[in-house]
């Protein structure tokens, strides 16, 4: 079991990469009201500019969205990028046979795990922050996109996987 723990940052890195791709490639906010359905793509919530897609019956509409980004989605995106770099460094350092670098790699993985946890939690609150930033009064028919929900879950799981070896090492010492 202990030999497998050194692969935890690598597993967390893979989960973080998938979460990063999902943020950019899937719908961030979805709207549904009877026959009318609409979506905002990932960059719309992250950067305030992107595409809005809609469908009414059989008619499809594509438009440009220019609004304000959700502050927590921007922070989650930044945390995810920092965690990706940190996990890449940590994954390399763990496999280097220098003891001091191995411990430092574990510390970097712990910090990256915390960033992934906070970023994943922030992603769940994108809809209220996006609605407040763009002054929407009613969000009853809006929902967080499925890809973003999966990205948030993967980020949280990656954070737990990344922090697990460091936490277990601390518990083992006591």
Where is each model-derived feature located?
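Short, Lys/Arg-rich, polar N-terminal cytosolic tail immediately upstream
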Residues: 1-2
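Signature of small four-pass
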Residues: 5-26, 69-126, 154-172
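A structural signal for the beta-strand cores of small, secreted beta-rich domains
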Residues: 17-18, 53, 150
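Long, glycine/tryptophan/cysteine-rich extracytoplasmic
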Residues: 23-71, 129-145
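Loop-to-transmembrane alpha-helix initiation sites
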Residues: 145-154
